UniProtKB/Swiss-Prot annotation:
Upper classification of the organism: Bacteria, Bacillati, Cyanobacteriota, Cyanophyceae, Synechococcales
InterPro entries: DNA_mismatch_repair_MutS (IPR005748), DNA_mismatch_repair_MutS-lik_N (IPR007695), DNA_mismatch_repair_MutS/MSH (IPR017261), DNA_mismatch_repair_MutS_C (IPR000432), DNA_mismatch_repair_MutS_clamp (IPR007861), DNA_mismatch_repair_MutS_core (IPR007696), DNA_mismatch_repair_MutS_N (IPR016151), DNA_mismatch_repair_MutS_sf (IPR036187)
SUPFAM superfamilies: DNA repair protein MutS, domain I, DNA repair protein MutS, domain II, DNA repair protein MutS, domain III, P-loop containing nucleoside triphosphate hydrolases
Name by which UniProt lists this protein: DNA mismatch repair protein MutS
HAMAP family recorded: MutS
Organism: Synechococcus sp. (strain WH7803)
């Protein structure tokens, strides 16, 4: 009879968000020693002596150690459901004194978290009441039922979700923008005459979740906070921005001026949640103009953002006497923003005293560190999502992402969203990519090591916050054990280590010791639950070994008891079994039930068998349960100690994880370059952009039956503006995007899809490719087009890359031509920005005769009788026709309409 069939009755859910209960400390007022007299002599000292006398050997890796104990489930609340909606629709409508004690406690907690959905654990369900129940039933399509609220109240609205499915439902609430407060059970057996102890164990918000199932594995989950000083007659608007990915510990701060810059930065960050206390002394904070519409704005009190409070919050969190070492006193608004953010994180993570969400020291983001990409450019270039439907497939990230780990995927996404401006840093990345492209065996060996890596960044964070499960710790050990192998492979090949890989050069010895400690303590495949035991190796702890020896003795007694009862009853088919509800029992067939001994007590009757218990068996059952409870509690204590040890090492684990992520991203880029026939661009600080046989990295992959037509480009060395003409649908927009993507790929350190390339660093990439009405803002297509053009003209410099696809087409022909001409002159003359301007205004070809730094190029077509063949080749010279009518015919416009269009064109030309 396996001892693991028994189950602890003293359990708690504390520290386990959605898992099975975890062992609890004994309740106050109750003895921590077993109640069974036979256990009085089983002191810690005697158990340790037993372990020494009967030493246990740890299982070798790969051996089975699968406990079969089942958690004891608390019965669900049994109130009958009602199909009628109760009268009480809001908790504020009731007098708490008239409520039942449980609902009174619920209302008290709800008053502390009015803006959040409060889920209250009752047995196997998380329930909510009043307005939360109504909202939950509507959003999650749950049945709205009711619960008795008291004699004077009657039934109140109630809706609930099963405990085992809570993570899935909470993830859906978070996705819809709700915040959730979880009130969990802190014990399973209340003190006599008292309510079951419950309390808020977690607050889940879109920007602070740590649970794997609520996070996108391959993108950061940013929480942001901003402090704004309004503009005055003498000073512009100034702002400080702090952003943190609570799941990875990454923290960044910056301070700038101008509302446009803030809007652009927030759009690029795409945070899950933005914290802001509003302007002035007004009550509620209205959505400011600099806040992107889709960003989730969470209002906060002003106090956490005050300078004194923010400074104290930072000092407490980082255990510092002064903030001078962080460099934040020079950025007062950023400091205040980070202080408010940190206070919000602390408020939403009710942790144990020895646990905290590990956040890195904030990194200061200086102006000019990254190539600037506004929202329009990121959308037009389809960096991480397609313009049509917002899907990953068809984007640049989809085309080049060959990373093998979640960490590497997030790293590559960050690179695409903020390409480098530092030439040395870019060249360091490119050198590694080049090494891995040419060294195929090295690349394959590294990728074999990377493939099974877990998400060390987020696993370390969960350990530090006290939320990591045993399998999380085993995954951390798996990853840390691979560090020496990665370092060995790289040291034999890399002459110069990029700064981003230095954490892998000489892994900290403490990390190897930590991995060994995890392996020494935990079995290789621990169960998901922390409450059922079966986590810790034999031979780790004398007290635990002594308890296990005692449980082995109980197993032996059960087996012997089964044999004896068979002999006494003369029934060889008798079985001694265990049921998690009824405990241990003797099972006999119906035919033999009448001949059982008189001292047997009938426990349950089934269709084909009868189940009995005996006083001796029941007494032994109590002994087993108490031993099991002590063993599970001891395992949990050992596990928590190990988890705390891992959490204390979160910073070095994450440093190594970021090195792994960088290596994964670089090896993925190398794989893309090697299989795609890409080249290593020659990078410099000039304005030159020379591309030979360049290709669009996404379109080339999507083409199946035809090959991509490559094209050249030479900008910045004599020519600053290219006027690009050609037919509709001939590939002008594709050519423009291809140029921008090659520039961007070069500045993240990647190879590029071309035969060769010389790339001077750009400070910004601007694109104006197509326009749509912004009816919500009251802007027509033409106004949107002009606003985008104005943004380019105000912010472009000689180092910018400007890609324009038609300007002025939304108004009268001569007005549009005039605007396009003036914009072209300004870009080529005053700004000298490197520009490619695709247009159907063929009159702009005349600019090349007036300005030496303007050149004409066209996309070629071939006319074969009535047919038009798009060659997709870009060559010198300006086109004289747009072939719009032919393009309309190819698009399926009815023949009579096409014929009439030709007649009108001839009349206009005459």
């Amino acid at each position: 009879m396996p001892r693991s069939a028994a189950q602890s009755e003293e359990q708690t859910l504390q520290g386990s968000l959605f898992g099975a209960p975890e062992p609890a400390e004994p309740a106050k007022g109750r003895s921590s020693q077993p109640a069974n007299p036979e256990l009085e002599d089983l002191t810690d000292a005697s158990l340790s002596a037993d372990a020494a006398a009967r030493p246990r050997q740890r299982q070798q890796r790969g051996e089975s150690n699968d406990p079969s104990a089942d958690a004891t489930a608390e019965a669900c609340d049994g109130d009958d459901a009602s199909s009628d909606e109760p009268a009480w629709a809001h908790h504020s409508q009731v007098d708490p004194a008239q409520l039942t004690p449980m609902l009174r406690h619920y209302v008290e907690l709800k008053a502390e978290h009015p803006e959040r959905v409060l889920l209250y654990r009752l047995g196997d369900f998380f329930e909510c009441f009043f307005e939360d129940a109504v909202e939950l039933s509507r959003v999650l399509e749950l049945t709205l039922t009711g619960k008795e609220g008291g004699k004077a109240i009657g039934r109140v609205p109630m809706a609930g979700i099963p405990h085992h499915a809570a993570e899935r439902y909470c993830a859906e609430l978070i996705r819809r923008g709700y915040s959730v407060a979880l009130c969990d059970q802190l014990e399973t057996t209340p003190a006599k005459g008292a309510l079951l102890k419950r309390g808020i164990t977690r607050v889940l918000t879109p920007g602070t979740v740590l649970e794997e199932g609520m996070l996108s594995a391959r993108r950061n989950n940013w929480l942001a906070a901003v402090v704004v000083e309004p503009a005055t007659s003498k000073t512009p608007l100034r702002w400080g921005l702090a952003s943190a990915d609570v799941s990875t510990g990454d923290v960044r701060v910056m301070e700038r001026t101008g509302s446009d810059g803030l809007h652009q930065q927030l759009a690029q960050l795409d945070a899950s949640e933005l914290l802001w206390a509003g302007d002035g002394d007004s009550g509620e904070a209205a959505r400011p103009t600099w806040c992107p519409e889709r960003l989730r704005l969470s209002p906060m009190a002003r106090t956490p953002f005050s300078a004194p409070q923010a400074e104290q919050t930072l000092k407490t969190h980082y255990q510092l006497a002064s903030l001078d070492g962080l460099g934040l006193p020079e950025l007062p608004l950023a400091l205040r923003a980070f202080g408010g953010l940190l206070q919000y994180v602390n408020d939403t993570q009710p942790l144990e005293e020895d646990a905290r969400v590990p956040l890195d020291v904030p990194a200061i983001v200086h102006s000019g560190e990254a190539l600037v990409l506004d929202a329009q450019t990121r959308r037009n270039l389809e960096l991480t999502a397609t313009q049509r439907d917002g899907q990953l497939q068809g984007s640049l990230l989809w085309a080049i992402d060959q990373t093998l780990t979640a960490m590497g995927g997030r790293c590559l996404r960050r690179w695409l969203e903020a390409p480098l401006m530092n030439l040395s840093a870019i060249q360091q990345r490119q050198a590694v990519v080049s090494l891995l492209v040419s060294g195929r065996p090295l690349r394959q060996a590294l990728r074999r090591l990377l493939r099974p890596m877990g998400d060390l960044e987020r696993l370390a964070g969960r350990a530090g916050a006290g939320h990591a499960g045993a399998r999380d710790l085993v995954a951390i050990a798996d990853g840390l054990e691979r560090l020496p192998q990665l370092a060995s492979r790289l040291q034999s090949s890399l002459e110069q280590w990029p700064n981003e890989l230095t954490a892998l050069q000489q892994p900290e010895p403490a990390l190897a010791e930590l991995a060994a400690s995890i392996r020494q303590t935990l079995i290789d495949a621990p169960p998901l639950s922390l409450s059922e035991g079966g986590l810790i190796h034999d031979g780790v702890d004398p007290l635990l070994d002594g308890l296990r020896n005692q449980l082995d003795d109980q197993d032996a007694w059960l087996a012997e008891q089964e044999r004896l009862e068979r002999e006494r009853s003369g029934n060889n088919n008798l079985r001694l079994q265990y049921h998690r509800t009824f405990g241990y029992f003797l099972a006999v067939s119906k035919a033999k039930a009448s001949s059982v001994p008189e001292h047997w007590i009938r426990r349950q009757t089934l269709a084909n068998e009868e189940r009995f218990i005996t006083p001796e068996l029941k007494e032994r059952e109590g002994r087993i349960f108490q031993l099991r409870a002590r063993a599970c509690q001891r395992e949990y204590e050992l596990y928590c100690s190990l988890r705390e040890q891992v959490g204390a090492m979160a910073a070095p684990i994450r440093a190594a994880a970021r090195g792994i992520a960088c290596l994964d991203a670089l090896s993925g880029l190398a794989d893309t370059a090697a299989t795609g026939g890409w080249c290593a661009p020659l990078l410099n600080d000039s304005r030159q952009l020379e591309i030979v046989a360049g290709r669009h990295p996404v379109v080339e992959q999507l083409l199946v039956e035809t090959s991509f037509t490559p094209n050249d480009l030479n900008l910045g060395s004599g020519t600053d503006l290219i006027v690009l003409t050609g037919p509709n649908a001939s590939g002008k927009s594709c050519y423009l995007r291809q140029i921008g993507l090659i520039q961007l790929l070069a500045q993240i350190g990647s190879w590029v899809p071309a035969t060769s390339a010389r790339v001077g660093l750009a400070d910004r990439i601007f694109t104006r490719v197509g326009a749509v009405d912004d009816l919500a803002a009251g802007q027509s297509t033409f106004m949107v087009e002009m606003a985008e053009t104005a943004n380019i003209l105000h912010h472009a410099s000689a180092r910018s890359l400007v890609l324009l696809d038609e300007i002025g087409r939304g108004t009268a022909t001569f007005d549009g031509l005039s605007i396009a001409w003036a914009v072209s002159e300004h870009l080529a003359g005053d700004l000298k920005a490197r520009t490619v301007f695709a247009t159907h205004y063929h009159e702009l070809n005349n600019l090349a005769g007036e300005r030496a730094n303007v050149a004409n190029f066209q996309v070629m077509v071939e006319e074969t009788g009535a047919d038009l063949v798009f060659l997709h080749q870009v060559q010198c010279g300006g086109a004289s026709r747009s072939y719009g009518i032919e393009a309309a015919r190819l698009a399926g416009v009815p023949t009579p309409v096409v014929q009439r269009a030709r007649q009108v064109l001839d009349q206009l030309a005459a």
